[in-house]
UniProtKB/Swiss-Prot annotation:
Residues with PTM Phosphotyrosine: Y158, Y310
Species of provenance: Rattus norvegicus (Rat)
Subcellular location: Membrane, Caveola; Cell membrane; Microsome; Endoplasmic reticulum
Phosphoserine modifications at: 21, 38, 42, 48, 120, 169, 171, 173, 177, 204-205, 302, 367-368, 381, 389, 391
UniProt keyword terms in alphabetical order: Acetylation, Cell membrane, Coiled coil, Cytoplasm, Endoplasmic reticulum, Isopeptide bond, Membrane, Microsome, Mitochondrion, Nucleus, Phosphoprotein, Repeat, RNA-binding, rRNA-binding, Transcription, Transcription regulation, Transcription termination, Ubl conjugation
The family this protein is said to belong to: Belongs to the CAVIN family.
Entry protein name: Caveolae-associated protein 1
Chain residue numbers at which the record places covalent cross-link Glycyl lysine isopeptide (Lys-Gly) (interchain with G-Cter in SUMO2): K118, K124, K163, K167, K172, K328
Length: 392
């Protein structure tokens, strides 16, 4: 709006003397002289009044236009303020949703931590039981070594089948043959019985002595044979081959149990790693992890003032509705050299060694394998120990 200078000339009223004029009052002669040119002065005053009115009208028009513009800008500002209020309300709603999601995630994380604690407690108990079993196995090995060194076994041998000599069987056959004619004699008449009875008594008395002698001889031979058999059985039981076989069996059983426990621990470790990776990806996505990594690197650099500064050019976008600003940031520094990664072949032996070391480190660090698998391991080890004791 342009600055306009407004000059207003006031018209003096007739009959009042001009206050600004100084000096004595005019004489009647001078008054007459001044009254003559009054017509020309009045015309000039009328023209100046018209000019002043036109200027006032133009100024009023400009003021009205400026007021209209101010009203329009005020209406636009009100619309923008309403839009900003809507955006703020939407942001508040999103923030409330984010707070609810954060609360739910915190609850899930707390539950997961409780489960992990329970699993760690169960793992500690199972580990204690496994250590006890290992101690018992060591004690058994020590006892076995001492027994092998002393050779103080007490072996009970039971013989079910007892072979009788041939003479005793002959005497039994003779007794049976004697019993048969006695039964036939009962069927015969009374007159014939006394003679046959006498003959039978004579035969039985002669053969009884022979049977007693045969029985005594057979008992002595049987005792000798049983003693010889027992000695042979003891020799076989305490032979070096038998002891070596028992040692080999015990070692094989122990190796089998160790291999089974290692395999089960590796399986549980793999399953737990998969579950933890799945939970980690659910809780923290990959993009979030990368952002956290970059923020950690930035914090580390900020705490180390002597770090190397690399040159970079970055474009950032800032959105302030209804405008979008593209800002390009250029930083001077050294050229960053990317390190090339080398691929190394890994053999099967290296994989096995790495798996064994990983399992050992997981056990030392207190990794939490599955409880059911560990209980199955303990049951299998108990079954192997029972089989070993039965075989011994």
């Amino acid at each position: 709006m342009e600055d306009v200078t407004l000059h207003i000339v006031e018209r003096p009223y007739s009959g009042y003397p001009d206050a600004s004029s100084e000096g004595p009052e005019p004489t009647p002669g001078e008054a007459r002289a001044t009254e003559e040119p009054s017509g020309t002065g009045s015309d000039e005053l009328i023209k100046s009044d018209q000019v002043n009115g036109v200027l006032v009208l133009s100024l009023l028009d400009k003021i009205i236009g400026a007021v209209d513009q101010i009203q329009l800008t005020q209406a636009q500002l009100e619309e923008r303020q309403a839009e900003m209020e809507g955006a703020v309300q939407s942001i508040q709603g999103e923030l409330s949703k984010l707070g609810k999601a954060h609360a739910t995630t915190s609850n899930t994380v707390s539950k997961l931590l409780e489960k992990v604690r329970k699993v760690s407690v169960n793992v500690k108990t199972v580990r204690g039981s496994l250590e006890r079993q290992a101690g018992q196995i060591k004690k058994l090995e020590v006892n076995e070594a001492e027994l092998l060194r002393r050779r103080n076994f007490k072996v009970m041998i039971y013989q079910d089948e007892v072979k009788l000599p041939a003479k005793l069987s002959v005497s039994k056959s003779l007794k049976e043959s004697e019993a048969l004619p006695e039964k036939e004699g009962d069927e015969l008449g009374e007159g014939e019985r006394p003679e046959e009875d006498a003959a039978a008594i004579e035969l039985s008395s002669d053969e009884a002595v022979e049977v007693e002698e045969v029985i005594e001889e057979s008992r002595a031979e049987r005792i000798k044979r049983s003693g010889l058999r027992r000695v042979d059985d003891f020799k076989k039981a305490f032979s070096k081959e038998k002891m070596e076989k028992t040692k080999v069996r015990t070692r094989e059983n122990l190796e089998k149990t160790r291999l089974k426990t290692k395999e089960n621990l590796e399986k549980t470790r793999h399953t737990l790693e998969k579950r933890m990776n799945k939970l980690g990806t659910r809780l923290v996505p990959v993009e979030r992890r990368e952002k956290l990594k970059t923020s950690r690197d930035k914090l580390r650099k900020s705490f180390t003032p002597d770090h190397v500064v690399y040159a970079r050019s970055k474009t950032a976008v800032y959105k302030v509705p209804p405008f979008t600003f593209h800002v390009k940031k250029i930083r001077e520094g050294e050229v960053e050299v990317l390190k090339a990664t080398e691929m190394v072949e890994v053999g099967p032996d290296d994989d096995e060694v790495g798996a064994e070391r990983g399992a050992e480190t997981d056990l030392l660090r207190g990794s939490s394998p599955d409880v059911h698998t560990l209980l199955e391991i303990t049951e299998e080890s108990d079954a192997v120990l029972v089989d070993k004791s039965d075989s011994d």
